Amino acid sequence: AGIGVLGVAKTMMTEIFGTTLPKTVNANFAASYVLMISLFNMGGRFFWASVSDYIGRKTTFTIFFVCGITLYLSIPYTAQQVSVSPSIVWLIYFYSATMVIFTMYGGGFATIPAYLADLFGTRFVGGIHGRLLTAWSTAGVLGPLAITSLRERSLQRSIEQMAKQVNPADFAAHFGAPVDQIQTLVLQKTVTLSKLMEIAPRGIVDPASTLYNSTMELMACLLGV
């Protein structure tokens, strides 16, 4: 599941925390986040491969699935909390959780050949592993597309919900068109979430931090399958 997140990791970090913790999460921070993903991914290959020699391959993959599902499901809660009560604590948790996820992603790559040998014997490892790598490559292409699609749906839903809470007169004055034309305005990039927040009533929480919640839930489901 982690491979689908790799291509959009920088964007995720910026959109989840950029609006709530702008002094901390900027372009340089997001770029360093991607660098750390690579380092933890590489380190996970050595760490989990070594650990699997002691606890067994099956136990190692059980840890991957259980911890992965738990961490993915905890991220939407983190995003929700940082949007309501911005705190660097939530950023630290998100950062740590995703780094653990990517160590397990790297560890999966490193330990899967040995696990396949344990299950099917060394004679069949080559063919099975080749098919598995093909599936991994496919996920690398389709994963970011699926994540982007889910994010766009969440964005559209958030814009529509927020538009309903904005005074129609304020909306028309700000965007030069009535609220019933919102679909056209969104396609033209005239209406965006940040622009809606400018005229939103007090107390409305910016939903930008939660746009990837459905994505994280999908990642957890994929691990469960």
Regions found by a protein language model. Give the residues of each.
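Juxtamembrane helix-start elements in MFS-like secondary transporters
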Residues: L21-I37, F61, W90, F94, ...
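Cytoplasmic membrane-interface "Motif A"-like loop-to-helix N-cap segments
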Residues: D53-V66
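Hydrophobic core of transmembrane alpha-helices in multi-pass small-molecule transporters
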Residues: P86-G107
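Paired intracellular helix-loop junctions of major facilitator superfamily
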Residues: Y115-G126
